[in-house]
Amino acid sequence: MKRRQFLSAALATTGAALAAETLLAQEAQAPAEDKRLHVAVNQYTCDTFYRRENVDFWTRLAEIKNAGVDGIEATLGSGNDTAAAGKRLADHGLAMRSIYTSGNLHDEEAGERELARLLEIGEKAKPFGTEIIVFNPAAKGGKSDTELIRQSKNMDTLGAGWKKLGIALAFHYHTTELEFGGREFHHVLCGTDPDNVLLCFEQHWSYRGSGNSQVAVFDHLKLYSDRVVSVHLRQSVNNVWSETFGEGDIDNVRLAAGLKKLPKTAHIVLEQAPENGTPKTLAPAEVFRRSAEYVRGMFG
């Protein structure tokens, strides 16, 4: 943060001394800046854990904040949704540094319409301090080469548009993008301008989408480390998603070491979620509290 400048040296000696003394007193009284690692939670995580309790997570924002969560990565589909979510989160002291959205950029007819909608989301998000939009291309198994090329071209255009707003496009992926040798995953990153399209590193989808392979996780990180601006964290035990983020199938010590070598400090977002076989022993707020504490200890 920029520090304010001292009073002009042209002031009288006594006046300057008094002014400096006053400023030092103000600094002493000011609260220390929070240096802890900023940890956000994805809306999918909030929704799935609170759904186990038959509760709408939007009614529990204060509880989520009190659990040690700094922000929520909301899932948004329109400009109006974006503005409404940003206000609700801000009212509860929750940041919206990143948001998540999707769109069909591989289809010739839908492309221009989708670009306009997505650019509006960026415009509406900017006033709330959003720095990253995590973008997952609309899923379609086995996209043709023509569709992949068109999609990457449109993502370049979208990323350039968001960049003008000071927002980074971070490519997000699931198992679909890793099918057929990962041709979609790799073409998005090889077929776009690194200044326009960056990466949300999905360590557990890299793992699961590659046949539960840690080799793939760390190869993906090594290949595209210069593009990573966001990281979604999820863990599993014996290939079933665990209730909290902690020790498990993916080596977090190695992951933390890799993330600390990134050229840019990545935005950390918890994306832990329950699935069939996930234990149910904790209330959602406790899941978030334990996960955030672990992440700060391991990755901070």
Model segments located where?
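Glycine-rich, proline-tolerant flexible connector loops at the mouths of alpha/beta enzymes
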Residues: 73-89
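Histidine-acidic metal/acid-base catalytic patches
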Residues: 2-40, 47-68, 182-201, 205-300
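Residue-level detector of anion-binding/catalytic polar loops
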Residues: 70-71, 95, 131, 168, ...
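The substrate-binding groove and active-site-proximal loops of carbohydrate-active enzymes
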Residues: 103-109, 246
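Active-site acidic/histidine proton-transfer and metal-coordination neighborhood
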Residues: 11, 18, 31, 88-91, ...
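A cross-domain feature marking catalytic cores of carbohydrate-active enzymes
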Residues: 41-45, 74-76, 98-103, 135-137, ...
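Short secondary-structure capping/turn micro-motifs that flank functional sites
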Residues: 80-81, 105-106, 141-142, 178-179, ...
